[in-house]
């Protein structure tokens, strides 16, 4: 026996329903084509107003449904191919849909514009209801922006999966065109960004008639002649101090040779280096002078530390007790009285005041530790039971009261003690 088509099943043999009742197709638990004992079919009442749209009253039966039949599935799913057209036209045959697909594709290829039922325009159909979005309701082709083709014609731009995506792609293409046009204009002008190392220099930077190329040549020549004469970068700095009274460090000379100084500073340093270069080539004793200056700097003795005997120290302590911060005139009188230099007396008073501040800080810290602290430390409570020495010996120990056994459960029945329970 052939299985009947959906919505054309005969009624149960022992059950018949009136024409005013129709099958509810939205119930997913009803499996009409299942070859097993059928489940009870739910029904809902069809009012006459709705029933008159589909036919007369006597025509409303279990198989009188004008909706397009679909392949049955237990749960709804998406069908991306021409669901809008199928729902709107109501063609029940899949062959007709295939013919429409081929016809729409051929028309799209001939006209060059996508149709509203194209697979590129998605539609999300819902079973037993009309589609929420049926594409272009007017049936006209969507006006998509066209892009100039290299052959001379216009090539239509294909739409993306959604209108929002198409707008975003158009915006990104516009930005790319702007960036490419800016780059092409910069390339036409011949502009180029300078390197990070030479960011402070430029091809047109000139100061005192010196260009960057001339500065590079001079730095290269300076390094070659310095190595040939046997001088170090530190020797050049000392020589500039001996000859011109302005000493430079080895780091400054190194940065000049490697062009890491600013162009303005290099222009200021170049005349001194040119004079030193001429002096080094003509004066043979220059290197000896440099070594002598370096030895004098190394052998320069530090000032001897002043030592005070007990008598002198006692007299200074007496003046300090009278006035801890004397003025310039008082310091001069004390230095004259003790036969010392004024700076020595001044430094001694400064050191003595600092020593007094340190003593006051230590005494305050000791009083805070030895006195009553606002918050008791946990070591005091531990020492009560475990025999540890208390942190503050001057404070009397604290002994907690015994455990209140009888007052533990005051809500219990009177006469019931916390001792041994008697049965």
From Swiss-Prot:
Subunit field text? Interacts with the transcription factors tcf7l1/tcf3 and vegt.
User: From start to end residue, where is composition biased (Polar residues)?
Assistant: 111-120, 156-173, 194-203
- What do the Gene Ontology cellular component annotations say? nucleus; transcription regulator complex
Q: Name one GO molecular function term.
A: RNA binding
Name this polypeptide is given: POU domain, class 5, transcription factor 1.3
Q: What is its main location?
A: nucleus
DNA-binding residues: 301-360
Spell out the residue ranges making up region: Disordered: 85-211
* Gene Ontology biological-process entries: cell differentiation; negative regulation of activin receptor signaling pathway; negative regulation of DNA-templated transcription
What is the annotated localization of this protein?
Nucleus
Q: Superkingdom of the source?
A: Eukaryota
Biological role stated in the UniProt entry: Transcription factor that binds to the octamer motif (5'-ATTTGCAT-3'). Antagonizes the activity of nodal/activin signaling during gastrulation to suppress mesendoderm formation. Acts maternally to inhibit vegt and beta-catenin-activated gene transcription, probably by forming a transcriptional repression complex on the promoters of target genes. Binds to an octamer motif in interspersed RNA.
Query: What are the record keywords, sorted?
Result: Developmental protein, Differentiation, DNA-binding, Homeobox, Nucleus, RNA-binding, Transcription, Transcription regulation
Q: Where is the POU-specific domain?
A: 207-281
